[in-house]
């Protein structure tokens, strides 16, 4: 009986940690996607996994692009750590990729999803990564870039399904 109580307590604590991600909860899991844009048509996979006892959410992403007339095949890898800022408790993220980019994001809920919006000096490009839920097993994503003083323009659009 005591063992059952320990297991039940453990499962309840896991549920509480999962709920802590609020508007990001629909992203937790493993995903496979396809899409295209400026870099060409590609495919890849990504995951959002709680880590550090549920205190952070880690996104790992891999995108592969086949060769085209303009460029050889290539692969893009990135890692993002999502956390609650202290003391504001607002969701924030820091992003690193294989092209040596580092981007700090604030995270804002949007209709049926979340938007990661870069922060930085006015004379630097801005970035916006938006995930929109398309049901429990699918989502849409859009990555946009805005040169200094300009509006956002779509760089990549993709759709993903839960694995």
Predicted regions and their residues:
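Hydrophobic h-region of N-terminal signal peptides that target proteins for export
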Residues: 8-17
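Hydrophobic small-molecule pocket/channel-lining residues, especially in calycin-type beta-barrels
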Residues: 17-163
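Positively charged n-region of N-terminal signal peptides that target proteins for export
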Residues: 1-4
């Amino acid at each position: 009986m005591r063992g059952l109580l320990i297991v039940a307590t453990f499962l309840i604590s896991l549920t509480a940690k999962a709920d802590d991600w609020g508007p990001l909860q629909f992203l937790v899991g493993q995903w496979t996607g396809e899409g295209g844009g400026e870099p060409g048509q590609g495919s890849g996979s990504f995951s959002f996994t709680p880590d550090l006892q549920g205190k952070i959410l880690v996104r790992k992403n891999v995108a592969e692009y086949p060769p085209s007339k303009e460029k050889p095949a290539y692969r893009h890898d990135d890692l993002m750590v999502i956390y609650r800022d202290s003391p504001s408790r607002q969701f924030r993220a820091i992003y690193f990729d294989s092209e040596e980019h580092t981007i700090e994001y604030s995270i804002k809920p949007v209709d049926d999803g979340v938007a990661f919006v870069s922060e930085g000096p006015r004379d630097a490009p801005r970035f916006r990564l938006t995930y929109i839920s398309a049901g429990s097993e699918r989502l849409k994503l859009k990555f946009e870039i805005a040169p200094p003083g300009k509006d956002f323009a779509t760089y990549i659009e993709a759709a993903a399904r839960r694995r």
